[in-house]
Regions:
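Catalytic-core "active-site belt" of small-molecule-metabolizing enzymes
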Residues: 1-103, 111-142
């Protein structure tokens, strides 16, 4: 799943951003669900989160997209996010001790789906002019 990822600066405000892909091991997640265990093994494993190229923070990011093997799977405007960045950071800061350098993954649009070993994953983040400001190009290995 594709997400806008923010890196916090000294004042706990967005400093930079990139596109990211967050993956889930559905077998481990399902086992955890069945047994009432935490989802840690399904969400936190080597290669589970891949980051694209970093760029300076800009509130005018308008779109994130994800293709798998050249097939578009996710494409959404950031204006459709459930929570805007300011509200998200306010909420997180109330519950967690945020620090400069922390990464905030902001959530994913509809269209998540399975990957297979060898799948090519390509994700982008574009500005208001449609210019790609962050991208990642990866091959699924797990």
């Amino acid at each position: 799943e594709v997400e806008l990822v923010i890196r916090l600066g000294e004042n706990l405000l967005p400093e930079s951003m990139c596109v990211g892909c967050d993956t889930t091991n559905r077998t481990h997640q399902g086992l955890a669900k069945e047994n009432g265990w935490p989802w840690t093994e399904g969400k936190s494993f080597r290669g589970s989160a891949v980051l694209g190229t970093w760029t300076d923070w800009n509130e005018d990011i308008k779109e994130i997209s994800l293709s798998v093997n050249d097939e578009l799977r996710q494409n959404a405007k950031t204006s459709l996010m459930v929570h805007d960045i300011k509200s998200l950071l306010f909420h997180l800061n109330r519950w967690y001790e945020l620090s400069p350098g922390d990464y905030i993954w902001t959530g994913t649009p509809k269209g998540v789906g399975p990957l297979k070993i060898g799948d090519r994953v390509y994700a982008t983040m574009s500005d208001v002019d449609g210019i790609i400001v962050s991208k990642l190009d990866a091959i699924c290995i797990n």
